[in-house]
From Swiss-Prot:
Pathway: Isoprenoid biosynthesis; isopentenyl diphosphate biosynthesis via DXP pathway; isopentenyl diphosphate from 1-deoxy-D-xylulose 5-phosphate: step 5/6
Pfam families with a match to the protein in the record: GcpE (PF04551)
Cofactor requirement: [4Fe-4S] cluster
Catalytic reactions on record: (2E)-4-hydroxy-3-methylbut-2-enyl diphosphate + oxidized [flavodoxin] + H2O + 2 H(+) = 2-C-methyl-D-erythritol 2,4-cyclic diphosphate + reduced [flavodoxin]
PANTHER family found in the cross-reference section: 4-HYDROXY-3-METHYLBUT-2-EN-1-YL DIPHOSPHATE SYNTHASE (PTHR30454), 4-HYDROXY-3-METHYLBUT-2-EN-1-YL DIPHOSPHATE SYNTHASE (FERREDOXIN), CHLOROPLASTIC (PTHR30454:SF0)
One GO molecular-function entry: 4-hydroxy-3-methylbut-2-en-1-yl diphosphate synthase activity (ferredoxin)
Binding site for [4Fe-4S] cluster: C264, C267, C299, E306
EC number: 1.17.7.3
Name of the protein in its database record: 4-hydroxy-3-methylbut-2-en-1-yl diphosphate synthase (flavodoxin)
The organism's place on the tree of life at top rank: Bacteria
Lineage, highest ranks first: Bacteria, Pseudomonadati, Campylobacterota, Epsilonproteobacteria, Campylobacterales
Length: 359
């Protein structure tokens, strides 16, 4: 685990700590109409099962705002209300939810922001100042355009507004739709404030596009010690946002959990359908949370070398294959018996490791 993380002020969203020494949390956003409590609850349940720590819901009208009271009662995750344009919806939402997200570029005047702050103070809930490059306040957009400098100036201006109202329980996000502006904005602001950062690339595209952008931007920032909570925005299935976010946390050294998959890119030596087999193995073992390095190889040439560094490896040969545990061959089996035996061995190893950690 990396030890270079920037220490920030800690806030709480429900029972989830954000900032300080707290683990970096993941979140997503439901796409149902929030007033449809059954559908929204179903999506929150899916996110909980996928490993999300927090959930955000859109509050587009008064009906959505009023539904939050009942939704909060059934939500298994802390609830963040996402408010644009209509500050009065934030006043209603603050009575029920665990946090409020506002976009200072469209929420309105200082008086409206003060009203939101007062409501959050009363309920002791935090705010996210959500700055987006595409919707900066007029004074910053005209002076700087949708640039990192413009985003940072907006964030500083709004942080000062909240501080002047004697309110410091907030986090900040600086989102653009491309990697470089996102990284530069967060880097620029980090030494200027003590508040926790919510990381994200906004409107990042489909699964492929978003995974690349988010891995580069968020992974890069995380490895620099920047970031306290995050969302990977994907045009697609909710669960993928959490799956990709947790993978980024693992591979940037911020989360020690789950399997690190090692598999070869295939070549003329492979003697099995490695693409299907690697996918099948990963799906079958996706429930494992124990940190393990697992190797799936299409021939013994690569496998014997890679297996020296893997906790468990499988190597396919001509209608047969090897299972290798911690560098030693423990099974040579016919192809038809390889898969199930390998799954059992990995699950047993995970149990052994968990037991040793508890002991």
């Amino acid at each position: 685990m990396l030890e270079n993380r920037v220490k920030t002020k800690q806030i709480f969203i429900g029972g989830v700590a954000i900032g300080g020494d707290a683990p970096i949390s993941t979140q997503s956003m439901t796409f149902s109409k929030t007033a449809d409590i059954e559908s929204t609850k179903n999506q929150i349940d899916r996110l909980k099962l996928a490993g999300a720590d927090l959930v955000r819901v859109a509050v587009s009208n008064e009906k959505d705002a009023l539904a939050l009271k009942e939704l909060k009662k059934v939500s298994p995750l802390p609830l963040i209300a996402d408010i644009h344009f209509h500050y009065k919806f934030a006043l209603i939402a603050a009575q029920s939810v665990d946090a409020i997200r506002i976009n200072p570029g469209n929420i309105g005047s200082k008086d409206k922001i003060k009203a939101v702050v007062d409501a959050c103070k009363e309920k002791n809930i935090p705010i996210r100042i959500g700055v987006n490059a595409g919707s900066l306040e007029k004074q910053f957009d005209q002076k700087y355009g949708p640039t990192p400098k413009g985003m940072v100036e907006s964030a500083l201006y709004n942080a000062k507004l909240l501080e002047d109202l004697d309110f410091t329980d907030f986090k900040i996000s600086l989102k653009a739709s491309d990697v470089m502006r996102t990284i530069e904005a967060y880097r620029m602001l980090r030494p200027l404030v003590i508040y926790p950062f919510h990381l994200g690339v906004t409107e990042a595209g489909n699964l492929f596009s978003s995974s690349i952008k988010s891995a580069m931007a968020l992974g890069g920032l995380l490895m620099e010690g920047i970031g306290d909570t995050m969302r990977v925005s994907i045009t697609g299935e909710l669960e993928n946002e959490i799956k990709v976010a947790r993978a980024i946390l693992r591979h940037s050294g911020r989360l020690k959990e789950g399997i690190n998959w090692i598999s070869c890119p295939t070549c003329g030596r492979i003697e099995a359908n490695l693409v299907d087999m690697a996918s099948k193995v990963e799906k079958r073992l996706s429930h494992i949370k124990t940190p393990l390095d697992i190797s799936v190889m299409g021939c013994v040439v690569n496998a014997l070398g890679e297996a020296k560094h893997a906790d468990m490896a499988i190597a396919f040969g001509n209608r047969s294959g090897l299972i290798i545990k911690e560098g030693k061959v423990i099974h040579k089996l016919a192809e038809k018996d390889l898969f199930e035996t390998f799954v059992i061995e990995v699950e047993n190893l995970a149990k052994e490791r968990e037991k040793s950690l508890k002991d």
